Amino acid sequence: MSEIVVLKLGGTTLVEQRQVLAEVATIARRRPVVIVHGGGKRMTEWLDRLGVPTRFDGGLRVTDAAAIEVAAAVLRGVVNSELVTALHDVGVDAVGLSGVDGGLLVGERVAGIGLVAHVVGIKRDLLDAILVGGQVPVVAPLARDEAGIVCLSLIHI
């Protein structure tokens, strides 16, 4: 398998930039691609709609138990599925999953901001199995920490 391209798409990109998705399709025809996505704007909309308070510290969302429940639902059930559908529309055989599926992402908690973690481990064989099948994994930014607790993952590429 040739070198894997990892693309990080922000929440604004998902909704507003069809051209970006067409470019992703072009890249995916040439090389294996893994997509990770954000969704902070959509999370904020849903948190506000449901009356869950949102607070930021140094630009990072402070995420408590109520917020992670909403975040997981929005990132997996709304943002990820919309992105997978949009990629299918431009000819990409995308498969949606989150970092907690199959233990894909392991996180280490960031002190002081609740259920937020830096990614410190990746279950590469799960990604490889999807890629070998010619599909593009689309990963929602969730991880389990060392205690197995679901956290919002910070993915820096």
Regions found by a protein language model. Name each.
Residues 48, 52-136:
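Ligand-binding beta-strand-loop-alpha-helix segment within the catalytic cores
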Residues 155-157:
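Conserved small/polar residues in nucleotide/adenosyl-binding loops
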Residues 1-35:
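N-terminal glycine-/serine-/threonine-rich phosphate-binding loop
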Residues 146-152:
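Short pre-catalytic strand/loop immediately N-terminal to key active-site residues, enriched for Gly-Thr
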Residues 10-12, 38-42, 59-61, 99-102, ...:
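Short, ordered loop/turn segments at secondary-structure junctions
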